Each structure stands twice: as C-alpha cells, then as structure tokens.
Amino acid sequence: MERTFAIIKPDAVERGLSGKIITKIEEAGFAIVGMKKIHLSRAQAEGFYYVHKERPFFNDLCSFMSRSPVIVMCLQKENAIADWRTLMGATNPANAEPGTIRKEFAKNIEENSSHGSDAPETAAFEIPYFFNSFELVG
C-alpha cells in the first residue's frame, strides 16, 4: 500500500465543499488514515511550500494557504500518489477532466481546491510535516 498527502485548500473549505471532496476520495477507494482541520500560519505555509520559494507565485500562494483553515489528509491505497493526482485533475481547472475535483470545485488556477504529493519523495516530506506516526491509523 502507498500513502500520499492531500490538502483541501481554503477556497473549498470556505465554500463548504469539504464533505463532497471527502466523499469523492472515499468513493475512489482511498482509505483516509489521517485527517485534521488546521489553520496554517504564514511560517507553516512558507515551510511547506519552500520548494517554490524562488517562484514568482510563492508569496501569493503562502498568503492564500494561510488565509483560512484547510483540511490535511494522509490517503492510502495501491498507487495512491498517481491515483490522487488523477482524481484531483489538472492544476488549471480549465484543463481538468470532467468528474475531477478541480473541474467540479476549483475557482481558478490559484484557488484550485486541492493539493497532492507529486512523488514518493514529496509524500515522504509532506506527510510528517503535518502528522506524527500516532496520528496515522491504518
């Protein structure tokens, strides 16, 4: 079994879409082995997105991610990383396939409702950034 990291971003939480997104996750066969609602500080957002520090969108991204609560999750299933990225859809919701989370729930490329690890190495950083081993069940 593989684990991946997922975030329901502020834009989706603010609009009350968390339950619908969680339902899609479970219907796709993922086990949610860790989940909590948190409000990231600016420093936490900067630490999490440090790989984008030199990118022009870094400040806006960190402001967005720390503006209101998010739901962080550790998801588990065979091929979890690729399957979660497929379920999320393209980063730009205009390019996302019908039925994907971003096509259904994202507002735009910046407020695209969800985040997911893009590789095993990324998941290995992202999961323990938010969860200790006692918080993961399954």
Curated annotation (Swiss-Prot):
The entry marks the following residues as binding ATP, namely K9, F57, R85, T91, R102, N112
Task: State which Enzyme Commission number(s) the record gives.
Answer: 2.7.4.6
> Mind listing the GO molecular function terms for this protein?
ATP binding; metal ion binding; nucleoside diphosphate kinase activity
> Could you tell me which Gene3D superfamilies the record lists for this protein?
Nucleoside diphosphate kinase-like domain (3.30.70.141)
Compartment list: Cytoplasm
Give the top-rank taxon of the lineage listed in the UniProt record for this protein: Bacteria
What does UniProt list as catalytic? Answer: H115
Provide the catalytic activity annotation: a 2'-deoxyribonucleoside 5'-diphosphate + ATP = a 2'-deoxyribonucleoside 5'-triphosphate + ADP; a ribonucleoside 5'-diphosphate + ATP = a ribonucleoside 5'-triphosphate + ADP
Q: Which cofactor does it need?
A: Mg(2+)
Q: Where does it primarily localize?
A: cytoplasm
Under the subunit heading, UniProt states: Homotetramer.
What does this protein's UniProt record list under function?
A: Major role in the synthesis of nucleoside triphosphates other than ATP. The ATP gamma phosphate is transferred to the NDP beta phosphate via a ping-pong mechanism, using a phosphorylated active-site intermediate.
The family annotation for this protein states:
Belongs to the NDK family.
**Name of this chain's protein:** Nucleoside diphosphate kinase
The organism encoding this protein is Trichlorobacter lovleyi (strain ATCC BAA-1151 / DSM 17278 / SZ) (Geobacter lovleyi)
Q: What is the lineage of its organism?
A: Bacteria, Pseudomonadati, Thermodesulfobacteriota, Desulfuromonadia, Geobacterales
